[in-house]
Each structure stands twice: as structure tokens, then as C-alpha cells.
Amino acid sequence: MNPISVDNVVTTYRFYAPLYDRLFGAAFEPGRRALTQAVRNLRPSSLLEVGVGTGLTLSQYPSTSRIVGIDISTHMLDIARERASKLPNHDIKLAAMNAESMDFPDGSFDCIAMPYVLSVTPNPEKLVAEIRRVCRKGGTILILNHFSGSRFWWFLERAVRSLADKIGFRSDFCFDEQILKYDWEIESVKKVNVFGLSKLVVIRNT
């Protein structure tokens, strides 16, 4: 598999930004709804969404939360800003930022939401270290992502691997290696999306 670089991610999403909602909106919406429902149940005073993209989740977050969304793609953020402008009752700030090196002080947020990001970042371990740093101790981290391992994924990974390499997407992404190896507290794991191909992982930051 070709290594993912920041330039690769930026170039990919410059191309996909106008098409993203049509290609990935409905297909991944069940997972997004599960994630935003979890956030509404938590009602955090402050929320950071890492990889806010085109802002598909913004309207589903509680209006009582201070919401910050970051993305490395300015083209995706342009669409997110248009969405945010139609939510006058929400406190939303959006910024272009590399999530592997964030500008926020330690413990800045009660809750971190990270939908469909972990498998497209150049360095997942560095990203995890950063989200743990900016989430307060005892806060909640929500990771929504596909993970490999099922028989269906075994076939799908091989079918899409060549394309995935070209667009900077890890099709072979192991749950044990990417989630279980850390010394955080996993509160729940829920299968979401068609065939349960993705998981919503709720984590207590320790």
C-alpha cells in the first residue's frame, strides 16, 4: 500500500469536495446519525469534530454545545461554512488545520468526534495522540470508521485496494491494531452502516 501524505489527502479532497455529498453522503449517513445521537446524549459543553469535511453532521449536534470543526481541506471547509451559515442557533467555528498537529491547548474539549478520518490520515498514531491531548481527562472520544477483519471485508479489501491506494485510503484497517492497543477505556462498540461495515467506538479519555 502506498503511504498516505498530507499533500495526497489535500489533492484528493480538492477533487472530491464538489462530489463528496453525492458519493458518500447517503451511504455513510447511518453512521453519522449514530455518532451525532451519541453526542446529543452526552450534551458536552464543548465539541471538536476532527475531519468536519462538508459539514454533514453540523445540524445534528446540540445547539447548546460550543462546536469547533477542523479539516485539512479548505475546499471541503468552504462547503461546511455554507452549511454552518444556515444554523444561526449553533455556536460553530470552522478552521483549516492538520489534526496531527493541532493548535489547541491541552484538555480544550469535553468531547471529540472523528467520523471517517482515522483510515485516511497519514499517521494514525500521531492523530490519536493529538485527540487524546486536546480532549480533557475523563472526556469522551467518538471514533467512527471502517475496520477490516470480516469475511466481507476480506473480499472487498482486495477488490478496492488498488483504487484505495490511489486516493489515499487504507482499505485494510485492523481494529485491534488501531483501537485496542491504546490504554484508554472503551465504553462501547457499535456496528453501523450497510452490512455493519463501520463501527462507532465510544472511548473515555484516560
Predicted regions and their residues:
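A short glycine-rich, Lys/Arg-flanked "PGG" loop and its adjoining helix->strand segment in the class I
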Residues: 125-137
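A short acidic, Gly/Pro-enriched loop at the edge of an enzyme's catalytic core
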Residues: 100-111
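C-terminal alpha-helical "lid/dimerization" subdomain adjacent to the S-adenosyl-L-methionine
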Residues: 7, 24-26, 142-198
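A short SAM/SAH-binding and catalytic strip from SAM-dependent methyltransferases
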Residues: 111-123
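Class I SAM-dependent methyltransferase SAM/SAH-binding core
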Residues: 48-101
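C-terminal lobe and adjacent flexible extensions of AdoMet/dcAdoMet transferase-like proteins
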Residues: 201-206
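A short hydrophobic/small-residue beta-strand
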Residues: 67, 141-142
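Conserved class I S-adenosyl-L-methionine
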Residues: 1-43, 56, 155-162, 193-196
